[in-house]
Amino acid sequence: MSENTFPGRLGINPFGPESRAANTEKPSTSHIVRVTERDEDKVNPTFNNKPLKKFAGDRATNTPLQAFKLGASDGFPEHYGMGRRTSVSAESLNPNPTASSNESWTPPYHRKTPEQLERLKKSISGNFLFNHLDDEQSAQVLGALVEKPIPVKDIKVISQGDQGDFFYVVEKGSFDVYVNPAGSVQPGLGGLGNKVATIEPGGSFGELALMYNAPRAATVISAEGSCTLWSLDRITFRRILMDSTFKCRRLYESFLEEVTLLSTLTKYERSKIADALVTLKYPAGTTIKEGDVGEEFYLLESGEAEAFKAGCQNAVKCYSKGDYFGELALLNDAPRAASVVSKTEVKVAKLGKDGFQRLLGPVESIMRRTKYEGVEEIDREFPGSAAAL
């Protein structure tokens, strides 16, 4: 249909299906690398299979190695105890890590120029770990991040099997990810393992070791020179990002309790949906266009939106807080046959197709019975389209 059929900001369609990388070695920059965590009790070797430069990242030190050597009179061999522990269990994995912590804690702050802040905001704008942060939390994260220039290729930023102390966001350049099935870097050729992905600007890595207090699950190496990373330390990561995730889940659960469609679900079922939702904000006039492939289901958290059909200038349905749309296109595996335009700035909770099919099975029959007043009349007048929002 013509792009001029509906009101709103035509041509802008953030609700459309997300792009998917054709090459598995070059994933979308919005994806975070996820690798299965390995056995914590593996000993961390210090060998690698190619000459990699030193990166002053996790537990870096400028102290000469000789300063750590013990004399013969100590009764210990040289370098005794120099290996890094990889099985650490002292840190709490409470889903709300700040619940019992010192309330006087304040996040670190590193002054940045306006130009640095703009670059950093752009780098994290598409990262899902930061999507649910409020303005105060976002400001804390921006203040705590530290710029880490990576001047040349083949600098090893993190090593599989090591204990992790930092989370990294890529601003510039690319980084290759290697995984060794043994669970850690091994000596000799091929010791890094297999290359499984490349992280590009906007991507991030290192969160798994901090979230689960486990060894690094992969080795990440700069794939080119003149790269730029931003690092966030373990404590700040856990206190801000993990605590905000916990709070976000609680907010979602409260919101889902108010959604009539989900009233028949158990608390456990709603909690699983809450974990899968992603919050997005859009300005007034943003459009989900008729004819798009349906890949997402939306719950309206705040704001107002309207549905339009081809050939009709008047809205056929209005949406407000607690309403939902996008379900029929997923239920019927059909293109969207109506356009939804945000009347005001809106905040929506998005659920992908896989999560929709897996988690909303118990209410499928209710969604199929949903009647869209006014849509049926439009369909009778324009029989070429079905009422699948």
Swiss-Prot record:
Q: Which gene encodes it?
A: pkar
- In this chain, the stretch annotated as Dimerization and phosphorylation covers 1-128
**Polar residues compositional bias, start-end:** 21-31, 87-105
Superkingdom of the source species: Eukaryota
What does the UniProt keyword field contain?
Answer: cAMP, cAMP-binding, Nucleotide-binding, Phosphoprotein, Repeat
Instruction: Provide the protein name.
Output: cAMP-dependent protein kinase regulatory subunit
User: Phosphoserine-modified residues are where?
Assistant: 87
Query: Could you tell me which species this protein originates from?
Result: Blumeria graminis (Powdery mildew)
The terms describing its cellular component in GO are: cAMP-dependent protein kinase complex; cytosol; nucleus
A Pfam family found in this protein is cNMP_binding
SMART domains assigned to the protein according to its UniProt record, in alphabetical order: cNMP
**Gene Ontology terms for molecular function:** cAMP binding; cAMP-dependent protein kinase inhibitor activity; protein kinase A catalytic subunit binding
Q: Binding positions for 3',5'-cyclic AMP 2?
A: 261-377
Q: Where is this region: Disordered?
A: 1-57, 87-110
Annotated residues for binding of 3',5'-cyclic AMP 1: 129-258
Identify its protein family: Belongs to the cAMP-dependent kinase regulatory chain family.
Q: Where is the composition biased (Basic and acidic residues)?
A: 34-43
